[in-house]
Amino acid sequence: MRALIVTAVTAEADSVVRGLSGPVPHPDHTPGPDHAREDGHGPRTLPGGYLIHRRGAFDVLVAGVGPAAAAAGTATALALAAAPDGYGLVVSAGIGGGFAPAAPIGSLVVADAIVAADLGAGTPQGFLTVTELGFGRSVHLPPAELAARAAEATGALLAPVLTVSTVTGTAARTAELAARHPLAGAEAMEGFGVAEAAAAHGLPVLEVRAVSNAVGPRDRDAWRIGEALTALADGFRALGPVLASWGGPS
């Protein structure tokens, strides 16, 4: 099965590609001249300027930061995928903030739910999700069996991952999110956008995050981006065979 792996920035894509090298072969595909060119000579550029790397069964996309950019980039790549060699799975991947103590710096989180944590409306009684407002969905659920296998293979925490448009930077906001989502493992900025695009194309979605910082008061000196990127590469080294062998939703 081919999978599209969507990252926000080049450093994340490079880590995923590093983890997937040497390539996990597509089980039903014999590489031809075009495939070899893509595997051996860096990324291609899609319409819209999106960079995409091919590694065996996987295409790794740099879509941009935030849910809107992630949705636009993902939708572009999915629309351009040629049938019958299209994608069977979409994965949102990158670094993010971890909710202490469950997800410490350097650990991985695999989403069992992808949650739009700040898409909705504020009211005197509290926050209302878009689902509660009647305007759509606020949660996407990855295939449970695949998410569990991914977490087991990588040693990741299996927990909800929150998508936010503004990274949490205060204790008050941390407490608010933790109260609304007590089981959350991580927050990031792209997962829900990727999931919306995947759903529009009828495809399942997974999210994998490597923790670079604790969700809480903003402290750049405490961030460990390099450590998180290494964890992301290590995670995809273990995850590649799981994704390549997955047969789709049962």
Residue locations for each model-derived region?
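Mid-sequence, gly/pro-rich, charge-dense loop/helix-turn segments that line enzyme active sites
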Residues: F99-H181
